[in-house]
C-alpha cells in the first residue's frame, strides 16, 4: 500500500480516523512541523513557492485581459466610456430560459454577458490601451511570465539552484534589492510607461511597438534633463478643456504638480501621477543603496537597532537583540509584512474613490462601491493575519533570554496595562455610541425627533478646513487666503497645488465629504469595532505564551482546544481562539464601514444628501432607510411574473444568507452531539443490507473543536461577504446602471 496523505507527517498518515484528512489539510502549509524539515529546507520551500504564487497571479490577470478581448466590448467602451457598460465576459449557462437570455443580453451584446465592476476597463484605458489586439498581446505576455515563474519555482527546488541559509539571513542585501531593485526600479519603469505611452495616448498620439523609438514624449527631448533645466517638463500642462484621448486642449508637460482632477475624466492628472511615481522611484532607489553589504559602507541594521537606546534609560535595553529575533523568525517577518500590506490595502480603498487615478472611474459608481468594499475586506483579513503570525512568533520563536529588558520584553511585561487600556476604550466607545443611538431611536419612536442628541464633528470639520474646505467657516491654513501654506512670503504666487482647492470645494467628487451628526455617530461605531478587534488580537498575541489562568501555554502550541476543567477550564484562551473571535469583530467593523461609505455615497451620487443626514442618527434609520430600502429590488429580484438582470444578484443574496446561516450549525453545537450522531449513523450503516457492503478506510469521527470553529467561521465569513456583495452591486447598479 502506498503512503497515505499527508506525506509530510507519518504520525498523522497512520491515524485510523477521518481526523487524518482534516488535520492533513489544516497543516498543509505548516512546513515547520513536517517530518525531517530543517531550517534551510524550510526557507527553500517557501522561497520556491513564491514563484508559484506569482505564476497564479500572472495567469489570473492574463485571463482578465483575454476574456475582455475575446468576449468584452473594450473597443466600443473606449469610444463612449460614460454611456457604455463594460462587459467582463460571456455567460454560458444551461439553466437560462428565454427570459434570462434576454435579460442578460445587455450592454449591446447579442448573448448573455456579465457586466464588469472591477475597474479594469478604466485602468487599461488610462494606461494607454485602446484595442482588443493590445489586450491579447498583454494576455500572451503574462502567460509567458506565468510559465517562466513556474519554471523558476521548479528550478529553485533543484539541488544546484537552492539558495543556502546564509543567503536568506542576509537582511541588508534583501532590503537593498527590494527597496531599490523592486520598488524603485518598478516605479521608474511605471513612470516611463506613463510618460512614453499613457500621456501621449491621452493626447491622441498613439505609441506602439512600431513607433515608440521615434515619438519623443516631450518636444524638448532630453536636453532639459541633462542641462538641469527640469522645469521645462512642467510647462504647458493640459488645459481644463482638454478632451481625453485627443489633442483638443492638450499641452506638452510630462511632470506636473497641478492637484485636483481632469475636468472631463474626473481622475487625477496623468502628468501628476507620472511625477508622483518618479519621486517614489528616486526615493526608493536611494534607499536601496543605504545598507551595508559587500563594500563595508552604509548602514548596518543591527548596529542601528543596538544603538537605539534613549539616554534616559526609559526603554531599558532598547532594541538590543531585536535584529536576530526578527531575522530568525519567519512568523515575525510575515506579521510585519501582513500589517504593512493591510494598512496599504485599506489606503488603496480610501484613495480609489477620493482621488480616483483612472479615467472615468469617478462616474462608474457601482465599480467604485465594489472596489472600496473589496479592498477594505482584504485589508481586514490581512490585518488579523498579522496578529495571528505575531502570536505564532511568540509561541514558537520568541526567546526570552535573547530579548532581556528590550522593547519587546517590556511590552510583554506590561501587557496587563495595554490590554486594560484597550478594554477601557472599547467599553467607553461602546456604551456611549450605543447610548446615543438608542436615545435617538427612543425619541424618534415617541414622536419627538427634536429631542435627539446631535453632535457636530467640529474637530473633524476643522481638519477638513485645514486642508482647504471652506464650507465650515474655519479660516485656518489652506482655508485662509493669507496663510503661508497658500502664498509664498513676498509674492502673490500660490505655492499650493492650484487644482486642489477647486477640487476640495467642488461638491461633485468624494474629496472630504461634508460631515454632520450622523457621521459623528457612525465614526465612533467604527472606532468601537476597530478598538475591540484590536483588543482581542493584542490580548491573544500577548497572552500566547501564558496568561493569568494558564501560565504554561508554550508546549500547548498556537491552537489548542478546550482542555477540560483541569486548569480551571481552558476554553477560549489559546491564541487561535483569539484570532477566531477577532475575525467576527473584524467582519462586523468592516460591515459598518462599508454600510456608511455606501449609504453616504448613494446620497452624494443621487444629489440627495438629506436622507443620510436625517436617518443616520438613529438605528431604525439605518435598518429601514439603508438596508431594507436598498434590498427591496433584491427581495423582488425574481417572481412569478418573470425576472430581470438583477435576478442573479437576488439569488446570490439568498444563497449568501444560506452559507452564512450554515456557519452557525458548526459554531453553536458542541462536538459530542455530532460524535453521537455519527456513531448512530455508523451503527445503522453497518446493519443495513447492501449498504454495509460499502466500507470506509478511515473511521468517521466528529470534527475537533478547533476544526469545527474554523469551518463555521469560514461559512460565516464567506456568506457574510457574498450577501453584502450582492446587495451592494445590485442596489447600486439598479439606480445608476
UniProtKB/Swiss-Prot annotation:
According to the record, cofactor stoichiometry and binding are noted as: P700 is a chlorophyll a/chlorophyll a' dimer, A0 is one or more chlorophyll a, A1 is one or both phylloquinones and FX is a shared 4Fe-4S iron-sulfur center.
**Membrane-spanning segments:** 46-69, 135-158, 175-199, 273-291, 330-353, 369-395, 417-439, 520-538, 578-599, 646-668, 710-730
Write out the annotated subcellular location: Plastid, Cyanelle thylakoid membrane
Keyword terms: 4Fe-4S, Chlorophyll, Chromophore, Cyanelle, Electron transport, Iron, Iron-sulfur, Magnesium, Membrane, Metal-binding, Oxidoreductase, Photosynthesis, Photosystem I, Plastid, Thylakoid, Transmembrane, Transmembrane helix, Transport
Tell me the Gene Ontology biological-process terms attached to this UniProt entry: photosynthesis
The positions annotated for binding phylloquinone are 674
The record lists the catalysed reaction(s) as: reduced [plastocyanin] + hnu + oxidized [2Fe-2S]-[ferredoxin] = oxidized [plastocyanin] + reduced [2Fe-2S]-[ferredoxin]
Q: Which domain of life is it from?
A: Eukaryota
Report residues binding chlorophyll a B3: 665, 673
* Bilayer topology term: Multi-pass membrane protein
Q: Where is this protein primarily located?
A: plastid
Complex formation: The PsaA/B heterodimer binds the P700 chlorophyll special pair and subsequent electron acceptors. PSI consists of a core antenna complex that captures photons, and an electron transfer chain that converts photonic excitation into a charge separation. The eukaryotic PSI reaction center is composed of at least 11 subunits.
Q: Which PANTHER family match?
A: OUTER MEMBRANE PROTEIN, OMPA-RELATED, PHOTOSYSTEM I P700 CHLOROPHYLL A APOPROTEIN A1-RELATED
Q: What does this protein do?
A: PsaA and PsaB bind P700, the primary electron donor of photosystem I (PSI), as well as the electron acceptors A0, A1 and FX. PSI is a cytochrome c6-ferredoxin oxidoreductase, converting photonic excitation into a charge separation, which transfers an electron from the donor P700 chlorophyll pair to the spectroscopically characterized acceptors A0, A1, FX, FA and FB in turn. Oxidized P700 is reduced on the lumenal side of the thylakoid membrane by cytochrome c6.
**Name of this protein:** Photosystem I P700 chlorophyll a apoprotein A2
The uppermost taxa in this organism's lineage are: Eukaryota, Glaucocystophyceae, Cyanophoraceae, Cyanophora
